[in-house]
């Protein structure tokens, strides 16, 4: 059985000059000292000390071997998203990031699955960048869970998600730029409290806005960190949908009806929490995620899954790798759309598109 980790990060060795591509939008770059100590930088400011696996593929592969991980999906670090930049500059930045991620993963192409990033602040550009990245070899796309005040149920962003469904590109959604940060000034509370709330907000937004009704069911979508607080609070949302018309106004079905529209990773760090998550999502909707190589990640890859009560060997195998292999499996090539016949009913009525092909 191949163990597959769907949630890991990379930060290529961008120079200070390269980081200036995102002037006034974070300017991310990586400083590596003479002794090998790494520091993620935002302009001139130190952001976070980091370990070598974040930029050194040899170190990552050694850590994977030590942890029994066969394959990792490799995605950018959220500091690199660039959503605050002008869209054209952000697209150039994403092309550079995506090229560097491909270079990084080329050290072990059978073990490292590259995930691209896109300028999500401009959904049309995001579609173009995602299409280029997929053609270049990226196996999925990594996005933040919002762009400013635009959440995943924003019409433009749902259009991007629909595009990913049409081209068969899996989507990994990661919380970032956490709400309420002004009230969470210490103890990493934005990561401990804000991130789970962000993900819960994104999932419920897609459900209650009716967005899942508009996005093709073929979309492969995964939320990090076990879907945040969603599983624990599903009952609250379900009760509200049944009892308040303002909750169900835009959603024809209750929240529980959309559970089969997305996956979550296993990064909840407690077998009891994972058991609840599996009970809510089902064994085929949960995949191993470690958050490698950050300090808040799972140090024993798959340890929580192995310790989770009530799983048989087959179910553990699904969580440890089987589900991820299916999630990231290359989409079958789409058959060419038939050319519609033109007759007196269609001539002069404007363009004729195959299903799903309208711009």
Please provide the spans of the model-predicted regions.
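Mid-to-C-terminal alpha-helical segments outside catalytic/metal-binding sites
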Residues: 1-9, 13-71, 99-107, 128-132, ...
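Aromatic- and acidic-residue-enriched segments that line the glycan-binding/catalytic groove
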Residues: 15-28, 88-91, 157, 237-244
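Divalent metal-dependent hydrolysis catalytic cores, especially in the metallo-beta-lactamase
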Residues: 41-52, 61-85, 111-119, 139-143
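Surface-exposed, active-site-proximal loop segments in enzymatic domains
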Residues: 77-93, 124, 186-189
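Short acidic/His/Gly/Ser-rich catalytic and metal-binding motifs that mark active-site loops
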Residues: 81-83, 126, 179-186, 296-298
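Long, hydrophobic, well-ordered secondary-structure blocks that form the structural core
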Residues: 87-94, 102-163
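Short glycine-enriched loops at secondary-structure junctions
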Residues: 120, 175-179, 292-294
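Catalytic pocket-lining loop regions of alpha/beta-barrel enzymes
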Residues: 130-287, 342-358
């Amino acid at each position: 059985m191949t163990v597959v980790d769907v949630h890991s990060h990379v930060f290529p060795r961008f120079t200070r000059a390269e980081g200036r591509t995102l002037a006034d939008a974070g300017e991310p770059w990586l400083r590596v000292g003479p002794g090998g100590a790494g520091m993620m930088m935002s302009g001139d400011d130190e952001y976070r000390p980091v370990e070598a696996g974040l930029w050194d593929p040899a170190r990552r592969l050694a850590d994977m071997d030590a942890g029994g991980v066969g394959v990792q999906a490799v995605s950018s670090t959220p500091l690199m998203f660039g959503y605050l930049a002008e869209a054209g500059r952000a697209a150039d930045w994403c092309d550079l990031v995506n090229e560097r991620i491909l270079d990084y993963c080329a050290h072990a192409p059978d073990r490292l699955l590259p995930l691209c990033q896109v300028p999500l602040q401009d959904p049309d550009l995001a579609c173009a960048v995602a299409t280029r990245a997929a053609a270049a070899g990226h196996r999925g796309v990594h996005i933040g869970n919002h762009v400013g005040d635009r959440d995943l149920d924003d019409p433009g962003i749902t259009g991007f998600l629909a595009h990913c469904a049409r081209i068969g590109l899996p989507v990994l959604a990661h919380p970032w730029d956490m709400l309420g940060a002004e009230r969470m000034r210490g103890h990493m509370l934005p990561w401990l409290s804000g991130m789970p709330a962000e993900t819960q907000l994104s999932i419920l937004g897609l459900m209650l806005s009716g967005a899942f009704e508009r996005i093709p069911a073929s979309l492969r979508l995964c939320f990090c960190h076990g879907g945040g607080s969603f599983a624990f609070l599903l009952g609250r949302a379900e009760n509200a949908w049944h009892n308040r018309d303002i909750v169900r106004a835009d959603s024809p079905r209750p929240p529980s009806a959309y559970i089969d529209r997305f996956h979550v990773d296993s990064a909840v760090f407690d077998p009891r929490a994972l058991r609840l998550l599996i009970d809510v999502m089902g064994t085929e909707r949960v995949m191993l995620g470690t958050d490698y190589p950050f300090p808040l990640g799972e140090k024993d890859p798959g340890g929580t899954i192995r310790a989770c009560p009530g799983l048989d060997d087959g179910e553990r195998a699904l969580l440890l790798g089987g589900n991820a292999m299916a999630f990231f499996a290359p989409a079958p090539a789409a058959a060419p759309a038939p050319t519609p016949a033109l007759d007196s009913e269609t001539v002069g009525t404007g363009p004729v598109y195959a299903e799903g092909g309208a711009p």
